[in-house]
Amino acid sequence: MIRRITERASGFAKNIPILKSSRFHGESLDSSVSPVLIPGVHVFHCQDAVGIVAKLSDCIAAKGGNILGYDVFVPENNNVFYSRSEFIFDPVKWPRSQVDEDFQTIAQRYGALNSVVRVPSIDPKYKIALLLSKQDHCLVEMLHKWQDGKLPVDITCVISNHERASNTHVMRFLERHGIPYHYVSTTKENKREDDILELVKDTDFLVLARYMQILSGNFLKGYGKDVINIHHGLLPSFKGGYPAKQAFDAGVKLIGATSHFVTEELDSGPIIEQMVESVSHRDNLRSFVQKSEDLEKKCLTRAIKSYCELRVLPYGTNKTVVF
């Protein structure tokens, strides 16, 4: 069951005109100005109960904020509650630290499993590291989206188990923007996971942009934060290597790409985003691969953007809610 509530901000106070006369020597009778309103996002996950939406809405309204959109999801036959609200507020009247405290009070009341606030104009961008192997089409797409301001992240470094020449487009781009590139040579016997953990220890999450190495359970536990992968196939079908060939051999009529959270089980983590494109008997393996690559880069950047905008929440043991 999905409940959606949408409100639009309207009727904000406008500047009061300045009244001038010889008596007041041109001074304003009222020098007030409209407040500077900034956007915020809040996500909430708890056991379902009566009055949660009212409490969260009242919290925003009581501080002079205004809700622009409110999404709620309560799964059928499952006593859990998910919500995501977008609102605007005056940070002078409602300081950033107080926003966290007020929502935390509600979280404690309902025993929330998740309550997160993000204010993009104040909060630092998420720090990420990108891991990849030989192919760089997903990396290039992410770098261009980041350069255009369409990907709200701070790319701390790029790590690869393949060395790249300094005169390539990717390396010149990274050098121009001051993004470190780390070549970490790996073997079947030594995946250099301790070295990678040291490089990414200060990041908020990791992105595997076609990193063709399986991360161990020890690595995932040692990192302790989310890792997002792009798989060049439509999961849960065609797991593992060469999914385009698997799909081609199976005679599918849709080819796809899947972005998902990484777990210890290969290509089996909760799915964040999937994209598909039609194929036919006229396609060959080469066109399958080309279409797959086009989908991969779009699918991955969309998943990262959704994650940064707090649209992705864990649901059950292996699902996600994506608002």
Swiss-Prot record:
EC number(s) stated in the UniProt entry for this protein: 3.5.1.10
Domain (ACT): residue spans on this chain: 41-124
Reactions catalysed: (6R)-10-formyltetrahydrofolate + H2O = (6S)-5,6,7,8-tetrahydrofolate + formate + H(+)
GO biological process, one term: photorespiration
Highest taxon of the lineage: Eukaryota
SUPFAM superfamilies xrefs: ACT-like, Formyltransferase
Annotated InterPro entries: ACT-like_dom_sf (IPR045865), Formyl-FH4-Hydrolase_C (IPR041729), Formyl_transf_N (IPR002376), Formyl_transf_N_sf (IPR036477), PurU (IPR004810), PurU_ACT (IPR044074)
Residues annotated as catalytic: 267
Gene3D superfamilies membership: 3.30.70.260, Formyl transferase, N-terminal domain
Class of the enzyme per the UniProt entry, highest EC level: hydrolase
One Pfam family linked to the record: Formyl_trans_N
Subcellular location: Mitochondrion
Any one GO cellular component localisation term in the record: mitochondrion
Phenotype of null mutants: No visible phenotype. Puru1 and puru2 double mutant shows a 70-fold increase in Gly levels and accumulates elevated levels of 5- and 10-formyl THF. Embryo development arrests between heart and early bent cotyledon stages, and mature seeds are shriveled, accumulate low amounts of lipids, and fail to germinate. Puru1 and puru2 double mutant is only conditionally lethal and is rescued by growth under nonphotorespiratory conditions. Puru1, puru2 and fold1 triple mutant shows no photorespiratory phenotype.
Tissue: Expressed in leaves, cotyledons, roots, seeds and flowers.
Transit peptide: 1-25
GO molecular function list: formyltetrahydrofolate deformylase activity
Keywords attached to this entry: Hydrolase, Mitochondrion, One-carbon metabolism, Photorespiration, Transit peptide
Role, per record: Deformylase involved in photorespiration. Prevents excessive accumulation of 5-formyl tetrahydrofolate (THF), a potent inhibitor of the Gly decarboxylase/Ser hydroxymethyltransferase complex.
Family as reported in the entry's similarity comment: Belongs to the PurU family.
Protein name in the entry: Formyltetrahydrofolate deformylase 1, mitochondrial
